[in-house]
Amino acid sequence: IFYQTSALASACHHSGIKISDGYLKATPPKAPVSAGYLTIHNNGSADINLTGARAAFAGMGAVHDMQMSNGVMTMTEVENGIMVSAGKIVSLAPGGLHLMFMGLNQQLKTGDEHTITLTFDKCGDLDVSLPVASNAMSGHNQSSHKNY
């Protein structure tokens, strides 16, 4: 399955940030939350920090992490953001770091595409358009890579 992650606008245009393998998790009707997954490539010469996310379809977005603690999977907000060192790659994937969208105002349907805004501490906001995929699909088999 092939999905395209496309740039819409960006204050990070010349910073060397590349987003790939992005998708949003499909939801049933009236679901209050969904998750977003993607890979951040920092091809620039400075470290960057992903500090937040937002989308028109959600009341709020945040960066979260899932970790196993005493045999129980827990999810917590990553309050200081996710550091992506210069020349490095960080993946946000199921079962680990991910974007959490809460207070959904619409169903996210498989095949649709939505714009989300990623906020980075050093280069501001980056808008990306992500496809919605069913729970059984993985965006990490995608071959499309976009430079922003």
Show where each model-derived region lies.
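Compact, glycine-rich, soluble single-domain proteins
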Residues: S10-Y148
